[in-house]
Amino acid sequence: MHFIFYLILLVSAADYGNFGTYPKVPKTASINGFADPIYDLLPDCAKECVKFSTSNTPCPYWDTGCFCVMPQWAGLVGQCVAQKCKGEDVASARFLATSLCSVVGANTWMMPASISSMLSTAAGDAKEVTTIEGKTAKSWVTAPGSAAGSVVSETGSASETGSSESAQSTTTGSSSTGSSSTDSSSSSSSSPSSSANFAVLQTGGIGSVILGFMMYLLV
């Protein structure tokens, strides 16, 4: 146990110590680093789902990429979306979350496989989303200086993968019922501030992913 604790400390130091090797994320947030960039774009049914306390993670409240690889937190978010939203609203929320994780370099939205399955069931036959506000996933997700067309997945656990989806996966910019969670372009329609937030988000270090995996082993 002590070995794992010290390993986490070392990984954290390596991840945050060399700031010049990877782009930056804003070190501030009104809700948290995961919610702020996508909140205005999320379908209404999913907005409360990104407001969970982050105290069950070691992440700074502003660290977007860290939340992407914390299954104990992402699982709560995913479960909430699956319970409160349906159809295209679910697809929209998943697209926004996985796209965000791609932008910051985590390249995965890590959660228990059972939660990923719940999301798939809640989405049903809804088409996947590749467009929000008339922008393609590729152009909208890629931040300045990052590789274009990067693929992001929604992973189950270290050993198990739930339903995966790429940042370029399907699109239907349509809204669903008020209590459904999908790729609703309409509920998230005009949000210049959110788009601006995406523009400044950049990739994190591989250490965040390792840190997330270590924390997953502990919970």
Swiss-Prot record:
GO terms for molecular function: heme binding; metal ion binding. GO terms for cellular component: cell surface; extracellular region; plasma membrane; side of membrane. GPI-linked hyphal surface heme-binding protein involved in heme-iron utilization. Heme transfer occurs between PGA7, RBT5 and CSA2 supporting a model in which the 3 CFEM proteins cooperate in a heme-acquisition system and form a cross-cell wall heme-transfer cascade. The ability to acquire iron from host tissues is a major virulence factor of pathogenic microorganisms. Required for biofilm formation. GO terms for biological process: intracellular iron ion homeostasis; single-species biofilm formation on inanimate substrate. Interacts with RBT5. The gene is PGA7. Its main location: secreted. Disruption phenotype: Leads to defects in hemoglobin utilization as sole source of iron and decreased virulence on a mouse model of systemic candidiasis. The keyword Chaperone does not apply. The lineage of its organism: Eukaryota, Fungi, Dikarya, Ascomycota, Saccharomycotina. A lipid is attached at residue 194 (GPI-anchor amidated serine). It comes from Candida albicans (strain SC5314 / ATCC MYA-2876). Residues 153-194 have a biased composition (Low complexity). It is found in: Secreted, Cell wall; Cell membrane. Induction: Induced by hypoxia, ketoconazole, fluconazole, nitric oxide, ciclopirox olamine, during cell wall regeneration following protoplasting, during adhesion, and during biofilm formation. Regulated by UPC2, BCR1, HAP43, and RIM101. Disulfide bonds join 45-85, 49-80, 59-66, 68-101. This is GPI-anchored hemophore PGA7.
